[in-house]
Curated annotation (Swiss-Prot):
Function, in words: Binds to 23S rRNA. Forms part of two intersubunit bridges in the 70S ribosome.
Protein name: Large ribosomal subunit protein uL14
SMART domains reported for this sequence: Ribosomal_L14
Keyword hit for Calcium: no
GO biological process: translation
Amino acid sequence: MIQNESYLVAADNSGAKVLRVIRVLGGSHKQFGTIGDIVVCSVREAVPNTDIKKGDVVKAVVVRTKKEIRRPDGSYIRFDDNAAVVLDKFNQPKGTRVFGPVARELREKGFMKIVSLAPEVW
């Protein structure tokens, strides 16, 4: 579960390293976000000499969470970290690579570009 002030690892090569959630988008009082949700984040750490700087406000989609999510078949999936991929204004990934596994739920939410860039889909 991702909420305001949660820290996320950037799972792409956009230039951000660590993100802090400002707001979970979707609904007027949406408190928690999970895999496939879009969040507004502040960049807390960034790679030098890239477009994204520390303090920038960006949109990102959550691709991994420590909190397990239940699938329709009754199985559960959870990951070792909370991670997100930085998005541009068209909700496409800003980076050209995605690191680590991503959840299959991203395909159902319409993030096909992220699924195709990921090394493995769980």
